[in-house]
Protein backbone atom coordinates (compact mmCIF):
# COMPACT_ATOMS: atom_id res chain seq x y z
CA UNK A 1 0.00 0.00 0.00
CA UNK A 2 2.00 2.95 -1.27
CA UNK A 3 -0.45 5.49 0.18
CA UNK A 4 -3.95 5.79 1.56
CA UNK A 5 -6.30 8.52 2.76
CA UNK A 6 -9.83 8.90 4.15
CA UNK A 7 -12.32 11.73 4.57
CA UNK A 8 -15.47 11.29 6.62
CA UNK A 9 -17.69 13.05 9.12
CA UNK A 10 -14.80 13.21 11.60
CA UNK A 11 -12.64 15.28 9.23
CA UNK A 12 -10.47 15.42 6.13
CA UNK A 13 -7.48 13.10 6.05
CA UNK A 14 -5.78 10.62 8.34
CA UNK A 15 -4.85 13.03 11.14
CA UNK A 16 -8.41 13.95 12.14
CA UNK A 17 -9.45 10.31 11.76
CA UNK A 18 -6.78 9.05 14.16
CA UNK A 19 -7.57 11.85 16.62
CA UNK A 20 -11.31 11.13 16.56
CA UNK A 21 -10.79 7.40 17.01
CA UNK A 22 -8.42 7.93 19.94
CA UNK A 23 -10.67 10.52 21.63
CA UNK A 24 -13.81 8.45 20.91
CA UNK A 25 -15.30 11.54 19.27
CA UNK A 26 -18.20 10.71 16.98
CA UNK A 27 -18.84 12.55 13.73
CA UNK A 28 -22.56 11.86 13.92
CA UNK A 29 -24.98 14.76 14.30
CA UNK A 30 -28.73 15.26 14.12
CA UNK A 31 -29.94 15.21 10.54
CA UNK A 32 -29.63 18.62 8.90
CA UNK A 33 -29.36 17.44 5.32
CA UNK A 34 -31.57 18.70 2.49
CA UNK A 35 -34.45 21.09 2.32
CA UNK A 36 -38.04 20.51 3.41
CA UNK A 37 -38.96 17.36 5.31
CA UNK A 38 -36.10 15.82 7.29
CA UNK A 39 -35.92 12.45 8.92
CA UNK A 40 -35.54 12.32 12.68
CA UNK A 41 -32.17 10.59 12.66
CA UNK A 42 -28.44 11.14 13.04
CA UNK A 43 -26.07 11.36 10.08
CA UNK A 44 -22.36 11.40 9.39
CA UNK A 45 -22.13 14.49 7.19
CA UNK A 46 -18.82 15.80 5.86
CA UNK A 47 -18.35 19.51 6.53
CA UNK A 48 -17.36 21.81 3.69
CA UNK A 49 -18.60 19.83 0.68
CA UNK A 50 -21.09 22.50 -0.36
CA UNK A 51 -18.46 25.24 -0.17
CA UNK A 52 -15.79 23.28 -2.05
CA UNK A 53 -15.23 23.56 -5.79
CA UNK A 54 -13.60 21.54 -8.54
CA UNK A 55 -10.80 23.00 -10.66
CA UNK A 56 -12.02 24.67 -13.85
CA UNK A 57 -10.61 21.81 -15.92
CA UNK A 58 -12.91 19.37 -14.09
CA UNK A 59 -16.03 21.54 -13.99
CA UNK A 60 -17.90 19.17 -16.29
CA UNK A 61 -17.97 16.56 -13.53
CA UNK A 62 -19.20 18.95 -10.84
CA UNK A 63 -21.65 17.43 -8.37
CA UNK A 64 -21.65 16.81 -4.65
CA UNK A 65 -20.23 13.29 -4.93
CA UNK A 66 -17.29 14.32 -7.08
CA UNK A 67 -16.58 17.35 -4.90
CA UNK A 68 -16.23 15.04 -1.92
CA UNK A 69 -13.95 12.81 -3.99
CA UNK A 70 -11.76 15.81 -4.83
CA UNK A 71 -11.54 16.83 -1.17
CA UNK A 72 -10.27 13.36 -0.31
CA UNK A 73 -7.82 13.15 -3.21
CA UNK A 74 -6.10 16.33 -2.02
CA UNK A 75 -5.47 15.04 1.51
CA UNK A 76 -2.36 13.33 2.91
CA UNK A 77 -0.23 14.04 -0.16
CA UNK A 78 -2.20 11.48 -2.12
CA UNK A 79 -2.13 13.42 -5.40
CA UNK A 80 1.66 13.58 -5.26
CA UNK A 81 1.97 9.85 -4.58
CA UNK A 82 -0.23 9.05 -7.57
CA UNK A 83 1.73 11.48 -9.75
CA UNK A 84 4.92 9.64 -8.81
CA UNK A 85 3.32 6.29 -9.65
CA UNK A 86 2.14 7.72 -12.98
CA UNK A 87 5.71 8.77 -13.74
CA UNK A 88 7.04 5.30 -12.85
CA UNK A 89 4.46 3.26 -14.70
CA UNK A 90 3.04 5.61 -17.32
CA UNK A 91 -0.50 6.93 -17.68
CA UNK A 92 -1.75 3.55 -18.94
CA UNK A 93 0.10 1.56 -16.32
CA UNK A 94 -2.12 2.66 -13.43
CA UNK A 95 -5.75 1.51 -13.20
CA UNK A 96 -8.62 3.24 -11.41
CA UNK A 97 -11.05 0.95 -9.58
CA UNK A 98 -13.59 2.75 -7.40
CA UNK A 99 -16.77 1.78 -5.61
CA UNK A 100 -20.01 3.64 -5.04
CA UNK A 101 -23.60 2.64 -4.38
CA UNK A 102 -25.37 5.79 -5.59
CA UNK A 103 -22.71 7.64 -7.61
CA UNK A 104 -24.05 11.11 -8.47
CA UNK A 105 -27.74 10.35 -8.00
CA UNK A 106 -28.07 13.45 -5.82
CA UNK A 107 -27.41 15.57 -8.92
CA UNK A 108 -30.05 13.62 -10.83
CA UNK A 109 -32.55 14.18 -8.02
CA UNK A 110 -31.87 17.91 -8.17
CA UNK A 111 -32.22 17.95 -11.95
CA UNK A 112 -35.67 16.36 -11.77
CA UNK A 113 -36.82 18.99 -9.28
CA UNK A 114 -35.78 21.76 -11.70
CA UNK A 115 -36.97 20.52 -15.09
CA UNK A 116 -37.23 23.23 -17.75
CA UNK A 117 -40.35 24.15 -19.68
CA UNK A 118 -39.81 21.29 -22.14
CA UNK A 119 -39.36 18.71 -19.42
CA UNK A 120 -35.58 18.59 -19.83
CA UNK A 121 -32.79 18.95 -17.29
CA UNK A 122 -31.78 22.54 -16.48
CA UNK A 123 -28.75 23.81 -18.39
CA UNK A 124 -26.35 23.62 -15.42
CA UNK A 125 -27.16 19.94 -14.93
CA UNK A 126 -27.45 18.91 -18.59
CA UNK A 127 -24.15 17.02 -18.34
CA UNK A 128 -24.73 13.31 -19.06
CA UNK A 129 -21.60 12.07 -17.28
CA UNK A 130 -22.89 13.09 -13.84
CA UNK A 131 -26.07 11.07 -14.35
CA UNK A 132 -24.38 7.70 -14.86
CA UNK A 133 -23.06 5.07 -12.42
CA UNK A 134 -19.55 5.66 -13.86
CA UNK A 135 -19.51 9.36 -12.96
CA UNK A 136 -17.12 8.73 -10.05
CA UNK A 137 -14.73 6.47 -11.95
CA UNK A 138 -14.54 8.79 -14.92
CA UNK A 139 -13.97 11.80 -12.68
CA UNK A 140 -11.18 10.16 -10.66
CA UNK A 141 -9.39 9.00 -13.80
CA UNK A 142 -9.53 12.48 -15.30
CA UNK A 143 -8.53 14.18 -12.05
CA UNK A 144 -5.46 11.95 -11.72
CA UNK A 145 -4.41 12.15 -15.37
CA UNK A 146 -4.53 8.38 -15.85
CA UNK A 147 -5.36 6.41 -19.01
CA UNK A 148 -5.36 2.80 -17.83
CA UNK A 149 -8.42 0.65 -17.15
CA UNK A 150 -11.16 2.51 -15.25
CA UNK A 151 -13.79 0.47 -13.43
CA UNK A 152 -16.69 1.52 -11.22
CA UNK A 153 -17.95 -1.16 -8.85
CA UNK A 154 -21.52 -0.89 -7.56
CA UNK A 155 -22.32 -3.81 -5.26
CA UNK A 156 -24.08 -1.80 -2.55
CA UNK A 157 -22.20 -1.59 0.74
CA UNK A 158 -19.38 -3.94 -0.30
CA UNK A 159 -18.47 -1.78 -3.31
CA UNK A 160 -15.24 -0.18 -2.11
CA UNK A 161 -14.03 -3.40 -0.50
CA UNK A 162 -14.44 -5.36 -3.72
CA UNK A 163 -12.30 -2.78 -5.55
CA UNK A 164 -9.22 -4.16 -3.78
CA UNK A 165 -9.86 -7.62 -5.19
CA UNK A 166 -10.46 -6.31 -8.70
CA UNK A 167 -7.32 -4.18 -8.58
CA UNK A 168 -5.23 -7.08 -7.29
CA UNK A 169 -6.39 -9.24 -10.17
CA UNK A 170 -5.47 -6.54 -12.69
CA UNK A 171 -1.99 -6.23 -11.18
CA UNK A 172 -1.38 -9.97 -10.84
CA UNK A 173 -2.47 -10.62 -14.43
CA UNK A 174 0.02 -8.03 -15.72
CA UNK A 175 -2.58 -5.66 -17.14
CA UNK A 176 -1.22 -2.80 -14.99
CA UNK A 177 1.58 -2.22 -12.51
CA UNK A 178 -0.48 -0.23 -10.03
CA UNK A 179 -4.03 0.79 -9.22
CA UNK A 180 -5.82 3.61 -7.42
CA UNK A 181 -8.70 2.08 -5.48
CA UNK A 182 -11.31 3.83 -3.41
CA UNK A 183 -14.91 4.70 -2.86
CA UNK A 184 -17.19 7.69 -2.46
CA UNK A 185 -20.83 7.99 -1.47
CA UNK A 186 -22.71 11.11 -0.45
CA UNK A 187 -25.99 11.66 1.33
CA UNK A 188 -29.08 12.39 -0.73
CA UNK A 189 -32.84 11.92 -0.55
CA UNK A 190 -32.77 8.49 -2.17
CA UNK A 191 -30.36 7.23 0.47
CA UNK A 192 -32.06 8.71 3.52
CA UNK A 193 -35.67 8.01 2.61
CA UNK A 194 -34.86 4.72 0.88
CA UNK A 195 -33.27 3.20 3.97
CA UNK A 196 -36.02 4.68 6.12
CA UNK A 197 -38.60 2.92 3.95
CA UNK A 198 -36.86 -0.35 4.82
CA UNK A 199 -37.28 0.53 8.52
CA UNK A 200 -33.50 0.33 9.05
CA UNK A 201 -32.79 3.91 10.20
CA UNK A 202 -32.42 4.72 13.89
CA UNK A 203 -33.68 7.93 15.50
CA UNK A 204 -30.60 7.92 17.76
CA UNK A 205 -26.87 7.51 17.06
CA UNK A 206 -26.25 3.93 15.97
CA UNK A 207 -25.19 1.38 18.61
CA UNK A 208 -23.54 -1.56 16.82
CA UNK A 209 -23.92 -4.95 18.51
CA UNK A 210 -25.69 -3.36 21.49
CA UNK A 211 -28.51 -5.43 22.93
CA UNK A 212 -30.81 -2.39 22.47
CA UNK A 213 -29.64 -1.37 18.96
CA UNK A 214 -32.34 0.25 16.86
CA UNK A 215 -30.84 0.62 13.41
CA UNK A 216 -28.20 2.42 11.43
CA UNK A 217 -26.99 5.99 11.10
CA UNK A 218 -26.25 6.93 7.51
CA UNK A 219 -23.07 8.75 6.59
CA UNK A 220 -20.98 9.93 3.68
CA UNK A 221 -17.27 9.52 3.03
CA UNK A 222 -14.49 9.26 0.48
CA UNK A 223 -11.26 7.32 0.61
CA UNK A 224 -8.49 6.12 -1.68
CA UNK A 225 -5.45 3.85 -1.64
CA UNK A 226 -2.61 3.26 -4.07
CA UNK A 227 -1.69 -0.38 -4.69
CA UNK A 228 1.53 -1.31 -6.50
CA UNK A 229 3.10 -4.60 -7.52
CA UNK A 230 6.30 -3.72 -5.68
CA UNK A 231 6.93 -1.36 -2.79
CA UNK A 232 7.05 -0.91 0.95
CA UNK A 233 4.28 -0.53 3.51
CA UNK A 234 1.33 -2.75 4.37
CA UNK A 235 0.12 -5.19 1.74
CA UNK A 236 -3.18 -6.67 0.66
CA UNK A 237 -2.50 -10.27 1.62
CA UNK A 238 -5.83 -11.83 0.76
CA UNK A 239 -9.45 -11.29 -0.08
CA UNK A 240 -12.62 -13.34 -0.08
CA UNK A 241 -15.83 -12.68 -1.97
CA UNK A 242 -19.19 -14.42 -1.86
CA UNK A 243 -22.78 -13.93 -2.96
CA UNK A 244 -25.61 -15.12 -0.72
CA UNK A 245 -28.37 -14.70 -3.31
CA UNK A 246 -30.66 -15.14 -0.31
CA UNK A 247 -32.66 -11.91 -0.09
CA UNK A 248 -32.57 -8.39 -1.48
CA UNK A 249 -31.86 -6.73 1.87
CA UNK A 250 -31.34 -9.46 4.49
CA UNK A 251 -28.20 -11.56 4.97
CA UNK A 252 -28.22 -15.34 4.88
CA UNK A 253 -29.75 -16.44 8.22
CA UNK A 254 -26.81 -18.72 9.01
CA UNK A 255 -24.19 -16.20 7.89
CA UNK A 256 -23.08 -18.52 5.08
CA UNK A 257 -21.85 -15.76 2.74
CA UNK A 258 -20.08 -13.85 5.51
CA UNK A 259 -18.24 -16.97 6.63
CA UNK A 260 -17.29 -17.92 3.07
CA UNK A 261 -15.85 -14.45 2.45
CA UNK A 262 -13.74 -14.53 5.62
CA UNK A 263 -12.56 -18.08 4.99
CA UNK A 264 -11.69 -17.14 1.41
CA UNK A 265 -9.53 -14.23 2.56
CA UNK A 266 -7.75 -16.43 5.10
CA UNK A 267 -7.14 -19.16 2.52
CA UNK A 268 -5.78 -16.79 -0.11
CA UNK A 269 -3.43 -15.23 2.44
CA UNK A 270 -2.31 -18.61 3.78
CA UNK A 271 -3.36 -17.66 7.31
CA UNK A 272 -5.50 -19.17 10.04
CA UNK A 273 -8.15 -17.44 12.19
CA UNK A 274 -5.67 -17.37 15.07
CA UNK A 275 -3.31 -15.21 12.97
CA UNK A 276 -5.78 -12.29 12.84
CA UNK A 277 -5.28 -9.63 15.49
CA UNK A 278 -8.10 -7.22 14.64
CA UNK A 279 -11.27 -7.30 12.55
CA UNK A 280 -13.17 -4.18 11.54
CA UNK A 281 -16.70 -5.55 11.35
CA UNK A 282 -19.46 -4.47 9.01
CA UNK A 283 -21.56 -3.90 12.16
CA UNK A 284 -24.32 -1.59 10.93
CA UNK A 285 -26.40 -1.75 14.16
CA UNK A 286 -29.39 -3.28 12.40
CA UNK A 287 -30.85 -6.23 14.30
CA UNK A 288 -30.23 -9.02 11.76
CA UNK A 289 -26.89 -7.85 10.32
CA UNK A 290 -25.22 -7.62 13.71
CA UNK A 291 -26.74 -10.85 15.00
CA UNK A 292 -25.56 -12.87 12.01
CA UNK A 293 -22.10 -11.30 11.75
CA UNK A 294 -21.49 -11.70 15.50
CA UNK A 295 -22.41 -15.37 15.30
CA UNK A 296 -20.09 -15.91 12.33
CA UNK A 297 -17.19 -14.21 14.14
CA UNK A 298 -17.77 -16.16 17.35
CA UNK A 299 -17.83 -19.44 15.43
CA UNK A 300 -14.69 -18.83 13.36
CA UNK A 301 -12.19 -16.81 15.41
CA UNK A 302 -10.54 -17.51 18.77
CA UNK A 303 -11.14 -15.35 21.81
CA UNK A 304 -7.74 -13.69 21.31
CA UNK A 305 -8.97 -11.86 18.20
CA UNK A 306 -10.20 -8.31 18.75
CA UNK A 307 -13.19 -7.12 16.73
CA UNK A 308 -15.29 -3.95 16.62
CA UNK A 309 -17.52 -1.79 14.47
CA UNK A 310 -16.47 1.82 13.84
CA UNK A 311 -19.74 3.04 12.37
CA UNK A 312 -20.44 4.97 15.58
CA UNK A 313 -17.73 7.39 14.41
CA UNK A 314 -18.59 7.77 10.72
CA UNK A 315 -22.07 6.36 10.24
CA UNK A 316 -22.73 3.74 7.60
CA UNK A 317 -21.13 5.25 4.52
CA UNK A 318 -22.63 2.70 2.12
CA UNK A 319 -20.45 2.23 -0.98
CA UNK A 320 -17.58 4.04 0.77
CA UNK A 321 -17.67 1.83 3.87
CA UNK A 322 -15.18 -0.67 2.49
CA UNK A 323 -12.41 1.86 1.89
CA UNK A 324 -13.02 3.92 5.04
CA UNK A 325 -13.00 0.89 7.29
CA UNK A 326 -10.02 -0.63 5.46
CA UNK A 327 -8.14 2.58 6.23
CA UNK A 328 -9.11 2.27 9.90
CA UNK A 329 -7.86 -1.32 9.90
CA UNK A 330 -4.62 -0.18 8.23
CA UNK A 331 -4.14 2.47 10.92
CA UNK A 332 -4.50 -0.25 13.57
CA UNK A 333 -1.94 -2.33 11.69
CA UNK A 334 0.58 0.50 11.42
CA UNK A 335 0.16 2.17 14.81
CA UNK A 336 -1.28 -0.48 17.12
CA UNK A 337 -4.24 1.77 17.96
CA UNK A 338 -7.27 -0.53 17.90
CA UNK A 339 -10.70 1.13 18.08
CA UNK A 340 -13.56 -0.24 20.10
CA UNK A 341 -17.27 0.18 19.38
CA UNK A 342 -18.62 3.68 19.96
CA UNK A 343 -22.04 4.48 21.54
CA UNK A 344 -22.69 0.87 22.55
CA UNK A 345 -22.97 0.02 26.24
CA UNK A 346 -24.15 -3.59 26.61
CA UNK A 347 -23.20 -6.17 24.00
CA UNK A 348 -25.83 -8.51 22.63
CA UNK A 349 -25.48 -11.91 24.34
CA UNK A 350 -24.98 -13.42 20.89
CA UNK A 351 -21.60 -11.67 20.63
CA UNK A 352 -18.51 -13.68 21.42
CA UNK A 353 -15.42 -12.60 23.38
CA UNK A 354 -13.93 -11.03 20.24
CA UNK A 355 -16.28 -8.02 20.34
CA UNK A 356 -14.80 -5.05 22.16
CA UNK A 357 -16.41 -1.82 23.34
CA UNK A 358 -13.25 -0.03 24.51
CA UNK A 359 -10.25 1.10 22.49
CA UNK A 360 -6.99 -0.69 23.10
CA UNK A 361 -3.32 -0.86 22.22
CA UNK A 362 -1.91 -4.01 20.67
CA UNK A 363 0.70 -4.99 18.13
CA UNK A 364 -1.17 -6.08 15.01
CA UNK A 365 0.43 -8.37 12.45
CA UNK A 366 -2.67 -9.06 10.37
CA UNK A 367 -5.98 -7.17 10.22
CA UNK A 368 -9.25 -7.90 8.44
CA UNK A 369 -12.07 -5.73 7.19
CA UNK A 370 -15.59 -7.03 6.49
CA UNK A 371 -18.04 -5.33 4.11
CA UNK A 372 -21.40 -6.95 3.45
CA UNK A 373 -23.92 -5.45 1.03
CA UNK A 374 -27.54 -5.83 -0.03
CA UNK A 375 -28.24 -8.87 -2.15
CA UNK A 376 -25.60 -10.82 -0.27
CA UNK A 377 -22.57 -9.13 -1.83
CA UNK A 378 -19.85 -9.96 0.70
CA UNK A 379 -16.17 -9.07 0.79
CA UNK A 380 -13.47 -9.62 3.39
CA UNK A 381 -9.99 -8.11 3.05
CA UNK A 382 -6.78 -9.10 4.84
CA UNK A 383 -3.88 -6.69 5.30
CA UNK A 384 -0.44 -7.19 6.77
CA UNK A 385 3.25 -6.93 6.03
CA UNK A 386 4.76 -9.30 3.48
PLM region descriptions:
Residues 79, 133-137, 141-144, 149-183, ...:
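Active-site-proximal alpha-helical scaffold in enzymes
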Residues 3, 21, 96, 140, ...:
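Conserved small-residue
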Residues 1-2, 14-15, 19-32, 38-42, ...:
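Condensing-enzyme catalytic core mediating Claisen C-C bond formation in acyl metabolism
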Residues 6, 56-77, 124-132, 150-162, ...:
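Active-site pocket-shaping loop/turn-to-helix segments
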Residues 175-197, 202-213, 239-253, 281-290, ...:
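Acyl-CoA/ACP chain-elongation machinery
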Residues 1, 91, 273-275, 351-386:
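Flexible, low-complexity linker/loop segments at domain and module junctions
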Residues 10, 15-98, 104-107, 261-273:
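Conserved active-site "lid/cap" helical segment
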